[in-house]
Amino acid sequence: MSNLSARTGRDHQRYDNNFRLVSGCIPYRLVKDEEEDSTSVDFENKLQVLMISSPNRHDLVFPKGGWEDDETVLEAASREAMEEAGVKGILREDPLGVWEFRSKSSSVEADCCLGGGCKGYMFALEVKEELAIWPEQDDRERRWLNVKEALELCRYEWMQSALEEFLRVMAEEGSTKEDSLAISSISNRGERQIDPRYCFVV
């Protein structure tokens, strides 16, 4: 049993026009072979995301929870990642997006707010540390999955949408890195220099 504790209660919960504000993240890691070029990414298998089971259920979700009035939306996402999934890392400041949703469970729906609606901010979290002990470890299981598996097993449609946006962002970033590597290789082939007007910092 964990000696750490998770926040409970709704005394500090933030709301926006009767929508309960929620913050969460998609924890991820890149699995690379030792001899593999660190800039290449096989998005089917090398990019993995961490999902967790819901309490008393076997379906899978990403860590998320109420955004409270004594923290920023980024702090809330980091806290939920630690409390629910037992991970810490580098949280990207730009959100993947904001999703409005209603829970299919009437009990959770009532907990969301008077109208049953929530507004969820989702971020990408590059995992740097997996804790052996974390607040909700007795109620949740962790599973690393590739993106295809995660899309198939994800419980909520809005989380699937967030995952698709996450994949788009990562694929875009991977393409940018490959372009930067190509420019670097060309510039080192001989004495010819690339016109600095066509070089970009990424």
UniProtKB/Swiss-Prot annotation:
Main location, first listed in the record: mitochondrion
Binding site for Mg(2+): E80, E84
InterPro entries in UniProt: DDP-like_NUDIX, NUDIX_hydrolase-like_dom_sf, NUDIX_hydrolase_CS, NUDIX_hydrolase_dom
Stated regulation of activity: Inhibited by fluoride.
Compartments (UniProt record): Mitochondrion
Pfam families the record matches: NUDIX (PF00293)
Reported tissue expression: Expressed in roots, leaves, stems and inflorescences.
pH effect summary: Optimum pH is 8.5.
Cofactor(s) the protein needs: Mg(2+)
Motif (Nudix box): 65-86
Keyword Magnesium attributed: yes
Consequences of knocking out this gene: No visible phenotype under normal growth conditions.
Subunit structure: Monomer.
Role description: Mediates the hydrolysis of some nucleoside diphosphate derivatives. Can use diadenosine 5',5'''-P(1)P(6) hexaphosphate (Ap(6)A), diadenosine 5',5'''-P(1)P(5) pentaphosphate (Ap(5)A) and adenosine tetraphosphate (p(4)A) as substrates, but not diadenosine 5',5'''-P(1)P(4) tetraphosphate (Ap(4)A), diadenosine 5',5'''-P(1)P(3) triphosphate (Ap(3)A), deoxyribonucleoside triphosphates, ribonucleoside triphosphates, diphosphoinositol pentakisphosphate (PP-InsP(5)) and 5-phospho-alpha-D-ribosyl diphosphate (PRPP).
Name used for this protein in its record: Nudix hydrolase 13, mitochondrial
Source species of the chain: Arabidopsis thaliana (Mouse-ear cress)
Gene: NUDT13
